[in-house]
């Protein structure tokens, strides 16, 4: 029974354990010696590839940047030219529009000008009158009228009455502005008494005689000087 137990459960001595450990270490050392240089070579190849890729990227970077800058400059120049063309066209259009508006305004002003009338002058005086509010006569205040005057309405309507609803006729001074010149008034009587025609003739002849006497006196003096 004891032999079977020993054959079934094999005992390992310390020597066998040491041998197995040394064999495992030698196998690991052999693997390290065989596969170590290969791994190092593969890692060095990978680092070289990565460095070459980086160099290529670094070389391509400035070239692409220069190309992008050139493209941006070309686009900016084209946009500036188009904007300048648009601005010039707009300025030309505005100039032509202003010229057309100026000619139209001048025509309208020439057509809408009305002859100045004394009634309008009176309205302007009444609207923009000067009133003296001080006792010394130095302070004048410029007043503007808010309501339209009746004279202007009458002048525009052309009716002979003051108001259309009333039957009161307009005074002659307003209807006929120069009524005094149109009337046949008697001649003005002078304050002093008028002289007769005889007196006027006598004065005329006396003046002539005095002139003749003066001429004779001057001729006599000239003759005496010659002698």
From Swiss-Prot:
Compositionally biased region (Polar residues): 77-104, 113-122
Identify the Pfam families for this entry: UPF0688
Subcellular localization, as worded in the UniProt entry: Nucleus
| Keyword entries, A-Z | Nucleus
Q: Which GO terms describe its cellular component?
A: nucleus
Main location class: nucleus
Query: What's the domain of life for this entry?
Result: Eukaryota
Q: List the disulfide bonds.
A: none
Could you say which protein family the record assigns here?
Belongs to the UPF0688 family.
Q: What is this protein called?
A: UPF0688 protein C1orf174 homolog
* Source organism of this protein record: Xenopus tropicalis (Western clawed frog)
**Lineage summary:** Eukaryota, Metazoa, Chordata, Craniata, Vertebrata
């Amino acid at each position: 029974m004891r032999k079977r137990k020993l054959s079934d459960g094999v005992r390992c001595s310390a020597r066998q354990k040491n041998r197995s450990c040394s064999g495992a270490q030698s196998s690991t050392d052999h693997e390290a010696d065989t596969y170590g240089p290969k791994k190092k070579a593969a890692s060095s190849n990978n680092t070289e590839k990565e460095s070459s890729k980086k160099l290529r990227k670094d070389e391509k970077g400035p070239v692409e940047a220069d190309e992008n800058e050139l493209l941006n400059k070309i686009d900016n120049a084209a946009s500036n030219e188009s904007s300048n063309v648009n601005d010039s066209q707009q300025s030309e259009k505005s100039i032509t529009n202003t010229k057309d508006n100026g000619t139209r305004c001048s025509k309208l002003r020439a057509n809408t000008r009305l002859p100045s009338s004394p009634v309008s002058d009176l309205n302007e005086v009444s609207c923009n009158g000067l009133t003296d509010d001080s006792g010394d006569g130095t302070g004048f205040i410029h007043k503007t009228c808010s309501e339209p005057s009746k004279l202007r309405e009458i002048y525009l309507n052309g009716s002979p009455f003051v108001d259309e609803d009333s039957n009161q006729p307009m005074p002659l001074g307003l209807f006929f502005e120069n009524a005094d010149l149109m009337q046949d008034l008697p001649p003005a009587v002078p304050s002093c008494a008028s002289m007769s025609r005889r007196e006027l003739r006598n004065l005329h002849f006396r003046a002539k005689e005095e002139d003749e006497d003066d001429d004779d006196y001057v001729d006599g003096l000239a003759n005496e000087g010659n002698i």
